């Protein structure tokens, strides 16, 4: 489970992670809070939860021994450097190299020569409509063979690459999404049957409030409703009110 730091501190993280310790479908905790902000608290948290805690690699985590393992990714040189340091402290890690089947083949080759790349890799290749390969990677019981052909050992699907060619001047799907207006309504249980409600116009705004501790996260019953742009006067008025308040 990746919390992206939203548990904020050791005390909050301890309460949530001890509950998740009982869930058999949870194996590892990533970034419950950003450990460099409280390395002593991170060490205490490690002692009080059963399952391993990992964080994106930083040398200070090695010096302070405040995580059980790491997330490592990036270019070849930095990945090898970080993995060597992690191995010297006997810290396992996963490779996080997100991309298509090509990236997955690369990750398999790289990870095969890194002694402590022992945790399940994250490449997200199954999220894409096409792997850009003529043959999909085969994963069996969580393992895949390192491709043995020339180069990365896989054959590129040239037709797929051509079909996904884009005009660099055209806006990306993310840009088109961000151009539209929406209201993000977050609700969670209040007193009795009442609900507490916060509304925002952008993900960045509600993330800022969560990180500041102004609104509580990870409560049972919390819900996010996305209200897409409407032509109604009520939507335009409410969106303008929220935007004027920086929400």
Predicted region positions:
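Catalytic core of soluble alpha/beta enzymes
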Residues: 1-106
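Flexible C-terminal active-site loop/helix
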Residues: 15, 99-247
